[in-house]
Amino acid sequence: MRTLVVFYSQGGETRWTAEQVARRLSAEMLELDPAKAYPQKGFAKFFHGGRDATFGAAPALKPYAFDGAAYDRIVFGTPVWAGSYAPPLRTFIEENRAALSGKRFAAFACQMGSGAERAFARLKKTLNAESLDGTLALISPLKKPDHANAERLDAFCAALERV
């Protein structure tokens, strides 16, 4: 199945995970980059990201190339912000809704604590998808690597290979 990993990463955790997923699935990657970067540190990082996630913002993105006809499945990768997915994914989905029609979807999320299941539910709703082929929630996989995260990543990719 021709797969594209579409992701937004602020601190590198989601980028690292996207690279692992893409390598295991022989998939291409598309990193979304907001036209105006989110703050990287301190209170502003959590305030701006959390506000935009909570209120469904769709920030402008820097130009990217996407040919929906080239892929059967899209795997979305996101940090968890205020129990939701990162707003750049919303922009991508809204800009490409027609090209995403009829595709299969999966998702992974990197989080510092909890909220991934809620983020997956919101992503599924935004996609108007009945289901996701698989989901994966990891807690700080780059900063706090552990055996459990590695096992979950392996299982997620193996399950997607069977679909």
What are these regions (language model features)?
Residues 1-76, 83-86, 90-95, 99-101, ...:
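N-terminal beta1-alpha1-beta2 submodule of the flavodoxin-like/Rossmannoid cofactor-binding fold
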Residues 100-104, 129:
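A short helix->loop->beta-strand "cap" motif at the edges of active sites that frequently abuts
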Residues 118-128:
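Short, aromatic/basic amphipathic alpha-helical patches
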Residues 76-77, 107:
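Redox-cofactor binding/interface segments in oxidoreductases and associated redox assembly factors
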Residues 109-114:
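Short beta-alpha junction loops
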Residues 25, 126-131:
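Short, structured coil segments at secondary-structure junctions
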Residues 131-163:
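Glycine-rich phosphate/pyrophosphate-binding loop and the adjoining helix
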